[in-house]
Amino acid sequence: IKTAADSNSRWRPVGLGVMGLQDAFFRLRYPFDSKEAQDLSKRIQEEIYFYALETSCELAEKYGPHTAFNDTRASDGMLQFDLWGVQPTDTARWNALKARIKTSGLRNSLLIAIAPTATIASIVGSYESIEPMVSTLFKRETLSGEFLQVNKYLIHELKQLGLWNDHI
């Protein structure tokens, strides 16, 4: 569709995100809603956002900013955390990047997305999205058929404790 192609050329959106966040929490034994899990999630998201912006800025320095850059808040030095009243961890690093973005622009208008989809998560063997796992045992229905999914971290723990058997 021409309008979609024109919009993509003008705004150049991409969607980078985190995959396996719940898996990391299981491995680290962090309850999903714990302070440790929240802090880790924040650090991961901040790093993804920082390096996505930095890379997009590098591409803008090489190829020019996306054509709608001057219409964005980023052109005024406003980034997502500014819009939500969130303080980044290393303000000096962020201030330097903001100044660079104001000077050079960004190659992409959108950088971050909530990922992955259920299908991609199943392919790579991780839990989907950034939400907590819905159940330790569930049936996934796809076009290829039905699949029983069991929490592999629970199985590992039960095996470690000598509690995993055919009856479970």
Spans of model-derived segments:
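Long, C-terminal-biased catalytic regions of enzyme "large/alpha" subunits
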Residues: 1-168
